[in-house]
A protein has these predicted regions:
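Blade-loop segments of beta-propeller domains
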Residues: 76-86, 106-108, 115-142
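Repeated scaffold domains used in trafficking and secretory/extracellular systems
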Residues: 86-88, 131-136, 170-178, 221-229, ...
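Asp-box/WD-like beta-propeller blade repeats and closely related beta-sheet repeat scaffolds
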Residues: 131-134, 148-198, 212-220
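Short beta-strand elements that form the blades of beta-propeller/WD-repeat-like
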Residues: 50, 95-101, 143-149, 181-192, ...
Length: 381
């Protein structure tokens, strides 16, 4: 059903890490609801897709019955593109962009075969230079890459040529943009200039505020962010996973509406009393099955889950065509197929029906050992 690609990390002689990418393609319940306005610009209506997940349910499918193909892309390693830690990945039609925030503080461009092409931008204070990277985005026409650097947007073409620098009228931890149409900014603590401390702000191309939604969950005892980037771009659409919920919203210029709601039997994020601190709450969350990451493709949406003690990341696939949900049980019968876990780097679309997950060098070597020792391989000799 789905194709999947992997970036694997290979050790160089100086023990720096380069990356390898894994590609998957094709994945696999929608309940109509009365239209309800949950905020001035937030809509829940009949387009809401409710996905019911029972972690202990009997009906499930082998990994290799859900994934059509797996391939691996080994990224080139040389002194010009040493990657210490992958913070974010983006894919255009021609290139794979890797952002390393914490070690290299750089964005590297590779072709689809893993060959290093160029670096995008550089550290500095001049035009087209940045101090500390936060996020990168592709314009929806895939003609420009935008680096977000502590309240500055640096625009480049895909050949690395600097186009312009823009200083927005707001500060955010996370951003996404749709060409010159609108920009979404998000900060968990709430916008500084907003008395209601709402987390999401949507602006037009001139940074004029269009609307704000989602009041901050921060208080005196709880100020813990919910992991990865809340704002994500899949295709030409922007999505927001509301922190500490399983609700995913599609963000548009004049409104946002709830697109997916994940209902987990005996799981999910529990309600949090106002006086509960971050440490106590995260311990409780660890005992529950909860959503870890997701990716939205053209025909499918895939949702990964996590819980303390899990040795792999279970997932379900929702088919937009059949409107059915398929749960993976982690088993496989093809020794070349493995149920890879997404780790701490957000999953990204490689193309319309393929998603990409980075894998460490040690993981790739362990997979090779499993293949060589697999009874499915040895029994066929």
């Amino acid at each position: 059903m789905i194709n999947y690609k992997s970036l694997s990390k290979l050790f160089t002689l100086c023990c720096n890490i380069v990356t390898v990418i894994i590609l998957f393609i094709n994945i696999g319940c929608q309940t109509p609801q009365n239209k309800v306005s949950t905020g001035e610009h937030i809509i829940s209506d009949s387009t809401l897709i409710q996905i019911n997940v029972d972690p202990d349910g009997e009906e499930s499918y082998a990994f290799d019955s859900l994934i059509d193909d797996i391939s691996y892309i080994k990224l080139e390693t040389n002194s010009d593109c040493l990657i210490g830690n992958i913070h974010q990945i983006l894919c255009s039609n021609e290139y794979i962009f890797i952002m390393d925030v914490f070690v290299a503080n750089a964005v590297y461009c590779f072709d689809k075969h893993g060959n290093f092409v160029r670096r995008i931008g550089k550290v500095g204070q001049g035009p087209g230079e940045y101090s500390r990277l936060c996020k990168m985005c592709l314009t929806s026409d895939q003609k420009q890459i935008v680096l977000y650097d502590w309240n500055r947007l640096h625009y480049y073409d895909l050949n690395g040529k600097h186009i312009k620098d823009v200083s927005p009228s707001f500060y955010a931890n996370d951003i996404e943009l749709i060409n010159n149409d609108f920009i979404a900014g998000f900060i968990e603590a709430g916008m500084d200039d907003d008395s209601q401390r709402q987390m999401l702000s949507v602006y037009d191309k001139d940074f004029k505020l269009l609307y704000r939604e989602f009041p901050s969950f921060y208080n005196e005892v709880f100020h813990l962010n919910n992991g990865m980037h809340p704002l994500r771009s899949f295709g030409n659409d922007i999505y927001l996973k509301e922190p500490w919920t399983h609700n995913i919203y599609k963000i548009e210029k004049d409104r946002c509406y709830e697109k997916y709601r994940i209902n987990i039997t005996n799981g999910g994020y529990p309600e949090r009393p106002e006086d509960m601190n971050s440490d106590t709450y995260i311990k409780i969350v660890g005992t529950k099955v909860h959503m870890a990451d997701y990716v939205i493709l053209e025909d499918y949406a895939l949702f990964y889950f996590s819980k303390n003690g899990f040795t792999w990341s279970p997932f379900v696939i929702y088919s937009h065509k059949t409107k059915k949900t398929y749960k993976c049980n982690g088993r496989y019968y093809n020794p070349l197929f493995f149920a890879h876990s997404p780790g701490n780097t957000p999953i990204v679309c490689y193309d319309k029906e393929t998603f990409l997950i980075p894998q460490s060098a040690t993981t790739v070597m362990r997979m090779k050992e499993q293949i060589y020792n697999s009874p499915l391989i040895n029994d066929s000799k």
